[in-house]
A protein has these predicted regions:
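Metal-dependent de-N-acetylase/amidase catalytic core
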Residues: 1-13, 86-260
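Active-site rim/loop-helix segments in enzyme catalytic domains that contact anionic ligands
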Residues: 1-101, 126, 130-137
Length: 260
């Protein structure tokens, strides 16, 4: 079975928000990928997390090549308005990186239904690979990882590229994850605490990459979690409208696919 022990010549990690790289801490330390970040992670606080991620990634040997293409609220506005040109331009930028840096593995956030930006990374990277002049001929692999789900298990046991962290790296990962979350002063701190409480810290000793598209979004009464959460925020008066998958995100994904 193929393993990430067979290190790629050059990997590209595409993530929705700064901080996601913590999920692949051991892999990042081993592979030292290029990293492209979709948004700046500012969310409702207005405070970017890019500098936190730059310090972390550079200390592990990674290189941030796209430090947050969109201010996070702007990303949602573009999706709600159905604008595709900025995302196609970003896909073309990623394609250029794949070609110029001879990337042979692209890794992205999986589609879990938790957050629209997370779910957008898969179609974005698919478009980038389709637009690349060399990805097909060079056999560039396309992999994904879970951002919020149980990190240890995947749907298909035959589609696993596991990394098992040694004690020192595991302790370092937990310590730096907590430190990053505290420094961010955002909802990320709550999410990190929730994941450690839910899955247990030891689950994060395991990092699993799987073939892109293996994951399926969890649905609640036919809705992705971010739609349900959006409805709650509208009722609370925090949002004016709900970003929905079929109405907003899917058409932008389809346009990306059609143009690439």
């Amino acid at each position: 079975m193929e393993s990430v022990e067979e290190q790629p010549h050059q990997a590209l990690l595409v993530i929705a928000h700064p901080g996601h790289e913590l999920r692949l801490y051991g892999w990042l330390r081993k592979v030292r990928p290029l990293i492209a970040i979709l948004t700046d992670g500012s969310g409702s606080t207005g405070i970017s997390r890019i500098d936190l991620s730059r310090d972390l990634c550079e200390s592990l040997g990674g290189e941030i090549v796209v430090p947050g293409r969109f201010v996070e609220p702007d990303f949602y506005s573009l999706i709600l308005r159905g604008e595709t040109a900025p995302f196609l331009a970003f896909a073309q930028e990623l394609a250029h990186i794949i070609d110029e840096r001879s990337v042979d593995v692209v890794v992205c956030d999986s589609v879990e239904g938790y957050h629209p930006a997370h779910d957008f990374c898969l179609p974005l990277t698919r478009a980038a690979l389709a637009l690349s002049a060399s990805a097909s001929s060079r056999g560039v692999r396309h992999l994904e990882y879970r951002v919020v789900g149980q990190p240890r298990t995947v749907n298909d046991a035959d589609a696993r590229w596991p990394v098992e962290l040694d004690d020192a790296t595991f302790s370092e990962k937990i310590r730096r994850s907590r430190r990053y979350a505290e420094a961010s002063g955002s909802v990320l701190a709550q999410e990190v605490a929730y994941m450690f409480d839910t899955y247990g810290e030891d689950a994060f000793r395991h990092e699993v990459l799987q073939r892109a598209g293996s994951e399926q979004p969890r649905l609640y009464d036919g809705m992705r979690y971010f739609e349900m959460r959006g409805e709650e925020q509208v009722r609370a008066g925090r949002y004016r409208s709900v970003l929905r998958y079929t109405e907003h995100l899917q058409p932008v994904e389809a346009a990306l696919c059609a143009r690439s």
